[in-house]
């Protein structure tokens, strides 16, 4: 978990970015002093150097992005469309699977002492 010193520097950097001010060690120190937080002297310089060549706006926007989404199932390549007779059979299979899964969800494994 982040320490108070780290959080103070992070919030200072976010405030500076929000005000469209360049993030520097001196400006981080000024905000931390104004907030009345005591921070080890190396933290503001560390954050200023780490954020010097980083686009903070894109960093904020991509925080939750875990990478590209998996591709959807491919469409059948060329050829005729599947027959309509096969579609109802597939629907019955899907319904049967849904019923089975609902039954298994209702059980929840409490039958051990029945």
Swiss-Prot record:
Compositional bias segments (type: Low complexity): 69-88
Any Gene Ontology biological process: translational elongation
PTM note: Ubiquitinated at Lys-92 and Lys-93 by RNF14 and RNF25 in response to ribosome collisions (ribosome stalling).
Modified sites of kind Phosphoserine: 101
A Pfam match: Ribosomal_60s
Cross-link (Glycyl lysine isopeptide (Lys-Gly) (interchain with G-Cter in ubiquitin)): 92-93
Modified residues (N-acetylalanine): 2
Quaternary structure and partners: Heterodimer with RPLP2 at the lateral ribosomal stalk of the large ribosomal subunit.
Protein name, per record: Large ribosomal subunit protein P1
Species, as recorded: Mus musculus (Mouse)
